Amino acid sequence: MEAVLNELVSVEDLKNFERKFQSEQAAGSVSKSTQFEYAWCLVRSKYNEDIRRGIVLLEELLPKGSKEEQRDYVFYLAVGNYRLKEYEKALKYVRGLLQTEPQNNQAKELERLIDKAMKKDGLVGMAIVGGMALGVAGLAGLIGLAVSKSKS
């Protein structure tokens, strides 16, 4: 599963699917499969703007898809949001998938990895806040010491 989350699309694949998407768009009608393939490539890009664009394309597809297609759309919506570190959104999508498919092992594993990332980021965030609080307390102590020395 971590390979799916960390896999980067090749520039060549991205350009090929982008050309196909733009060609169909210019002709006036983009097929669901072309839009999904392009979105799937964008979600695997190393650039956040590409990932966001892929998410938008997947969200557009969601109401149009069959049950099987929707499962794929929701899964890659979770992957895209995970890659953007939008863990709450990723969790929302993966849990929605697990409501309809409680035995989906891929979704269970993705949920576990999202929870793990949230805990890691939460601990890192708490450490940063804690370090800042210690820094402020230390600075206040130094100021207090300087003031008391200047009075004596």
UniProtKB/Swiss-Prot annotation:
Source species: Mus musculus (Mouse)
Signal peptide region: none
Record's keyword terms, sorted: Acetylation, Apoptosis, Membrane, Mitochondrion, Mitochondrion outer membrane, Peroxisome, Phosphoprotein, TPR repeat, Transmembrane, Transmembrane helix, Ubl conjugation
Stored CDD domains: Fis1
Stated name of the protein: Mitochondrial fission 1 protein
Alphabetized InterPro entries for the sequence: Fis1, Fis1_cytosol, Fis1_TPR_C, Fis1_TPR_N, TPR-like_helical_dom_sf
Family: Belongs to the FIS1 family.
Swiss-Prot/TrEMBL domain comment: The C-terminus is required for mitochondrial or peroxisomal localization, while the N-terminus is necessary for mitochondrial or peroxisomal fission, localization and regulation of the interaction with DNM1L.
UniProt-annotated location(s): Mitochondrion outer membrane; Peroxisome membrane
